[in-house]
């Protein structure tokens, strides 16, 4: 699907999902990778994974600003692939799938990750020339 106007933001999606009674968790990709790494260090990864498995919608935002080492990539893959047939995941990024090689070191893992992300999914191309935030700010006056 392609959406020509950028009217939908993460905040709106979270609000609407919560109002509909869904359990939602929002992370930036970097924060999720950091929380997973911290959970491993604190010996509480299984607790975090169990917590994430109980939510209806996991939103991972900004998957394009920093690269992930092999370990971080593996942990992100584990979380995303575990949810692939069981619960919803929204990933926002300004990169096409072909550009994800810039983010992840392991190309085989990346291929499996993209396969998990795209299986039975809707891919929305929301790249547009205008910005909802900028338009909203300019029209606020």
Which residues does each predicted region cover?
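Single conserved hydrophobic/aromatic residue that forms the stacking wall/gate
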Residues: 1-9, 13-14
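The start of beta-strands in P-loop NTPase/AAA+ ATPase cores
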Residues: 23, 56-57
